[in-house]
Structures are given as structure tokens and as C-alpha cells.
């Protein structure tokens, strides 16, 4: 699982490298912590044990939680990709991922749909 300080570091590096407004949204560090607890709750209480599902839950919790002043979608996506990489699953960062994250943040794509997307991209990358 990704810890609070690691997620904040990911966000800060994104802001440093790509620009944007630094800092936390209204709930401060507690907002980030709450988003991470949502992921942990899905794992522990809902029995979520699929790598793609957990990664997608990170993306959704951070992007929809608007826990930072800026770069929530980028941070959510990077956390999802990082989680998968830590589990030995590396998927290419395709151009449509950023558009997909807009739909994730707006509620147009569920965590289940995002997990299916991650799985499909990974499976395609394995056949190359």
C-alpha cells in the first residue's frame, strides 16, 4: 500500500516538474489520509485484492477527493501506476490515460471500469 508521505511526495514532485498550485485542499493532510483510508477500507472490508482494482481505487479516491489544491488527477494516476509497478506490473502511460482521468474525476468512469482498462492495457502490452 502507498503511505501518506509517499503520496504527498509524488504530488509535490508533479507540481515541481509540471507546475501548478502546491498545497492541500481545505481538509489539509487529513484529506489525503482520508483518501488513502478509502483504499485500505476497500481492501480490508470489501475484500478487494486485485492489483488493478486497488490501483484504480487509488486513482479514484485521490482524483475525486480533490485532496490537493491542484494536480489531483495527475497524482491519482501516478499513484495508481506506481502501485502497479510495485506489484511488478508496468503498463505504458498512454496519451488517453489523462483524458480518462478527467472522466474518473467527473464520475463518468468507475473504479471498476478503470481497473478493467488497466488490465486490458497490461494484457496488450504483454502480447507485444
Predicted regions and their residues:
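FIC/Doc superfamily catalytic core
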Residues: 1-128
Amino acid at each position: 500500500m502507498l503511505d501518506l508521505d509517499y503520496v504527498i511526495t509524488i504530488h509535490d514532485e508533479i507540481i515541481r516538474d509540471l507546475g501548478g498550485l502546491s498545497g492541500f485542499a481545505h481538509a489539509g493532510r487529513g484529506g489525503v489520509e482520508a483518501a488513502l483510508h478509502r483504499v485500505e477500507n476497500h481492501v480490508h472490508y470489501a475484500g478487494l485484492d486485485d492489483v488493478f482494482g486497488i490501483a484504480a481505487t487509488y486513482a479514484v479516491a485521490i482524483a475525486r477527493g480533490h485532496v490537493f489544491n491542484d494536480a489531483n488527477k495527475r497524482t491519482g494516476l501516478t499513484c495508481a501506476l506506481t502501485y502497479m509497478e510495485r506489484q511488478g506490473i508496468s503498463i505504458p502511460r498512454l496519451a488517453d490515460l489523462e483524458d480518462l482521468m478527467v472522466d474518473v474525476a467527473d464520475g463518468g468512469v468507475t473504479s471498476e471500469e478503470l481497473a478493467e482498462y488497466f488490465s486490458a492495457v497490461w494484457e496488450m502490452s504483454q502480447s507485444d
